[in-house]
């Protein structure tokens, strides 16, 4: 590649070369810093004895991950496994995934967007074969230690998935895809609608506090007082839960809630960058946690 155009463009060029010269049945994609267990590849390849399987991905084991990354990755993998059992998952980890070459149309890759792994996984399923994540097969990679690098990585990945899901909207209600269509709708709701709802909730919270500060609220009204106290308590619990993951405090239950909030904040940032026309499909790899 003569000039830097982003990872997806590089993946597309590599796939075109493979299809033109090698004629292989299966394609394995990984990252330069990903480590495999001794039986990772062999266990992934076993799945292809089933002709309905088009793509299989391994489950990540992260080294040095922050509290929010640990919580996010646990929930992310759980959802991938559930989707795999229902039908197929639209998202896999590009650090270790294998697919049938004939099931993937490389021309469908959008080179000005990232999430190349999700693009490949979804394309294979749309062509009729199942896409699954194997919960018992692992790869190992490094997660950023610093909050700044963690957030930068999450926002970039979030934007890629959001843009990918929006491009798939014609498949959200396509009955030909069976149970995969509801999965796409669910992921679109989680990655696009939910963060927008959080923005609405934040605006409503600020408006409520403004009304308390500038309007004459009758706190002798027991019902109104109970409502405000209840909302204040809920807001403080949610804020405290976010602080636990923001500053690496391990507190059960609060960490899980904080992980969800933190993830949606990254999704909001990704939506904002997209709204401003900022594309994150080209980036500098984080060095934090790799040395």
Label every model-predicted segment.
Residues 210-213, 244-248:
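Juxtamembrane "helix-exit" motif on the non-cytosolic side of transmembrane helices
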Residues 48-76, 111-116, 120-187, 259-265, ...:
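Catalytic donor/gating beta->alpha subdomain of glycosyltransferases that bind UDP-sugars
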Residues 2-3, 24, 32-34, 116:
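Short acidic donor-binding/metal-coordinating loop in glycosyltransferase active sites
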């Amino acid at each position: 590649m003569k000039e830097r155009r982003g990872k997806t463009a590089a993946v597309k060029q590599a796939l075109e070369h493979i299809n033109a010269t090698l004629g292989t049945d299966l394609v394995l994609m990984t990252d330069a810093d990903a480590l495999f267990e001794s039986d990772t590849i062999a266990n992934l390849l076993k799945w292809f004895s089933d002709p309905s399987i088009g793509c299989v991905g391994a489950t990540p084991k992260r080294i040095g991950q922050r509290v929010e990354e640990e919580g996010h990755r646990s929930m992310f993998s759980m959802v991938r496994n559930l989707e795999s059992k229902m039908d197929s998952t639209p998202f896999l980890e590009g650090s270790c995934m294998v697919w049938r070459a004939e099931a993937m149309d490389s021309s469908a890759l959008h080179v000005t967007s990232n999430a190349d792994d999700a693009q490949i996984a979804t394309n294979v399923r749309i062509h009729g074969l199942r896409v699954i994540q194997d919960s018992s097969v692992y790869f190992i990679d490094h997660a950023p230690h610093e909050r700044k690098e963690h957030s930068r990585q999450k926002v970039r990945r979030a934007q890629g998935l959001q843009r990918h899901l929006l491009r798939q909207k014609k498949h959200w209600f396509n009955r030909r895809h069976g149970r995969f269509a509801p999965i796409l709708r669910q992921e679109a709701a989680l990655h696009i609608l939910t963060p927008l709802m959080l923005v609405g909730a934040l605006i409503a919270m600020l408006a409520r506090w403004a009304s308390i500060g500038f309007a004459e609220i009758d706190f002798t009204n027991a019902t109104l007082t109970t409502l405000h106290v209840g909302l204040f308590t809920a807001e403080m619990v949610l804020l405290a839960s976010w602080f636990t993951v923001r500053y690496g405090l391990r507190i059960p239950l609060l960490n899980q809630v904080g992980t969800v909030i933190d993830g949606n904040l990254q999704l909001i940032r990704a939506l904002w960058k997209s709204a401003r026309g900022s594309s994150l499909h080209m980036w500098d790899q984080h060095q934090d946690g790799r040395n």
